[in-house]
Amino acid sequence: MLGIGERMNLGMPNRYLFDTMEARLLLAGRIRVTKPDVLFCPLPLDAHPDHLAASALAEGARFYAKYTKLSLEGEPWYTPRLFYYSCSHLHAVPDYSFLVDISQHFEKKME
């Protein structure tokens, strides 16, 4: 659906996702290798601990991926755009900066 050529799992299982330095560096290395133009992460306004950790982890890894003096695989890279998506476990309605209408793709998503 997204046209992504590869899906990676960094070995961080459900309910055991934590924002640690080890996890940040692991993700930062993947960011350096893949050089994404955009990162997506959960909005850090959520009741689910994994979603909060994923948000902090993505922000931290994005920051560390640009450092020149870290011995990580790949060349330093700074992802220019970071977008947050809402999981709405709190049923909160944040003041979004923009919304994307996915209604024409919803049926395919449900497959």
Segments from the language model and where they lie:
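Metal-dependent de-N-acetylase/amidase catalytic core
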Residues: 12, 18-111
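A conserved beta-strand->alpha-helix junction
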Residues: 2-15
